């Protein structure tokens, strides 16, 4: 029954065979990173991962770890996991230009978080009217430290659905 055990893993980053799971930081639909309308993400300049077309209002911790930085404009944050993953979550494209409007910080930098802990509130209807795109890239910036990345597709629930996994 090893096949079915993969569907019922504990809610932590590390599963069997040194595979580390990354969970959805926001609910919505997975989009290929290459489809993000910003070359920094679509060309994988800052790392590899996926994007999510969001349909909810809170960005959650996608891994267990420590919040490294919450950007002053509240549109992005980074987390370093207990498994040495450096993860970057960036809400929308050109959201930095809003200077924090439409966002509210829930958590703080240098705080230990668990999968599903709230980090930033977003006013999705407000932001949809003002930004180029609400696609939310979720990127591993130190992807070169891992052997393999396996990306999932489909609809996701924040804090519950694995969006991709990496193998050490």
UniProtKB/Swiss-Prot annotation:
Its main location: cytoplasm. The modification Phosphohistidine is found at residue 90. NCBIfam families: PRK09439.1, PTBA. Residues 38-142 form the PTS EIIA type-1 domain. GO terms for cellular component: cytoplasm. It is found in: Cytoplasm. This is PTS system glucose-specific EIIA component. The gene is crr. PANTHER family: PTS SYSTEM GLUCOSE-SPECIFIC EIIA COMPONENT. Keywords: Cytoplasm, Kinase, Metal-binding, Phosphoprotein, Phosphotransferase system, Sugar transport, Transferase, Transport, Zinc. Zn(2+) binds at residues 75, 90. GO terms for molecular function: kinase activity; metal ion binding. Its cofactor is Zn(2+). The phosphoenolpyruvate-dependent sugar phosphotransferase system (sugar PTS), a major carbohydrate active transport system, catalyzes the phosphorylation of incoming sugar substrates concomitantly with their translocation across the cell membrane. The enzyme II complex composed of PtsG and Crr is involved in glucose transport. The EIIA domain is phosphorylated by phospho-HPr on a histidyl residue. Then, it transfers the phosphoryl group to the EIIB domain. The record marks 75 as: Important for phospho-donor activity. It comes from the Bacteria. The active site is at residue 90. InterPro entries: Dup_hybrid_motif, PTS_EIIA_1_perm, PTS_EIIA_component. One of its GO terms (biological process) is phosphoenolpyruvate-dependent sugar phosphotransferase system. The lineage of its organism: Bacteria, Pseudomonadati, Pseudomonadota, Gammaproteobacteria, Enterobacterales.
């Amino acid at each position: 029954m090893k096949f079915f055990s993969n569907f019922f893993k504990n809610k932590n980053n590390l599963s069997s065979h040194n595979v580390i799971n990354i969970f959805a930081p926001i609910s919505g639909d997975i989009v290929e990173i290459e489809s993000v309308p910003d070359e920094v993400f679509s060309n994988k300049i800052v790392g590899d991962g996926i994007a999510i077309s969001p349909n909810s209002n809170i960005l959650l911790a996608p891994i267990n770890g420590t919040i490294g930085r919450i950007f002053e404009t509240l549109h992005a944050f980074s987390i370093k996991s207990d498994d040495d993953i450096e993860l970057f979550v960036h809400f929308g494209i050109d959201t930095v230009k809003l200077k924090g409007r439409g966002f509210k910080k829930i958590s703080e930098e240098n705080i230990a978080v668990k999968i599903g802990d709230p980090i930033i509130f977003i006013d999705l209807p407000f932001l949809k009217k003002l930004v180029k795109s609400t696609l939310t890239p979720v990127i591993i910036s130190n992807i070169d430290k891992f052997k393999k990345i396996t990306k999932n597709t489909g609809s996701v629930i924040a804090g519950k659905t694995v969006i991709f996994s990496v193998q050490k």
